[in-house]
């Protein structure tokens, strides 16, 4: 069956930006700027995704830190290509209970390929109560909405639905370097090679339009 390319509308992205402003406004009365930490595992695509996560967080008014004991929000962007990477992530996520004990209001989010797998979501639900928010790569574009829901509901939020994937343009970016950037031209894969998890967690192959790549 042929895959139908699906694109997130620019209006939907704008709604996420409105939520960013809503979160930003909620921090105005605070004396100190809130801080976020984005911890990235895996491939260059994850690096590119983390630039989008940081872009959204910057729009919300967050500064950035590499110290989990300073962070108000921690986002762990995970990899699923090798079992060792998954075990490393889970070990490090488990250690975050120390920072959360020191900062009870700290929000810990786990996203990326690892949590696109149903068994990993169930494992986090049962064994990692320190985690407040879980979302797969197909839900990255609505990170502000999911974070706000976590903040306001005071309940754990899980959003890792099965999907062939989307193309979402127009998300804000915050890059670590002023001289280089991760530039995605396509997402997913159609090959379904033996032992490869990529099509199952990243979805079907879909390309960005040339005009969006060079914009």
Model-found features: residue ranges?
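Proteins enriched for Cys/Gly/acidic motifs involved in redox and nucleic-acid/cofactor modification
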Residues: 1-215
């Amino acid at each position: 069956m042929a895959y139908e390319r699906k694109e997130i509308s620019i209006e939907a992205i704008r709604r996420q930006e409105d939520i960013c402003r809503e979160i930003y406004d909620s921090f105005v009365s605070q004396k100190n700027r809130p801080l976020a930490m984005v911890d990235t595992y895996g491939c260059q695509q994850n690096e590119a995704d983390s630039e989008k996560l940081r872009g959204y967080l910057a729009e919300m008014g967050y500064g950035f830190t590499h110290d989990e004991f300073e962070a108000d929000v921690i986002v762990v962007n995970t990899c699923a290509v090798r079992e060792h990477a998954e075990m490393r992530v889970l070990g490090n996520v488990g250690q975050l209970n120390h920072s959360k004990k020191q900062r009870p209001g700290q929000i810990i989010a786990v996203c990326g390929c690892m949590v696109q797998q149903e068994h990993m979501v169930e494992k986090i639900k049962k064994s990692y109560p320190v985690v407040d928010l879980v979302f797969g790569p197909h839900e990255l574009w609505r990170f502000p909405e999911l974070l706000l829901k976590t903040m306001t509901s005071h309940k754990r939020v899980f959003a890792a639905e099965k999907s062939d994937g989307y193309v979402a343009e127009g998300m804000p970016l915050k890059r670590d370097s002023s001289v280089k950037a991760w530039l995605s031209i396509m997402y997913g894969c159609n090959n379904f090679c033996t032992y490869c998890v990529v099509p199952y967690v990243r979805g079907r192959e879909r390309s960005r339009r040339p005009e969006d790549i060079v914009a």
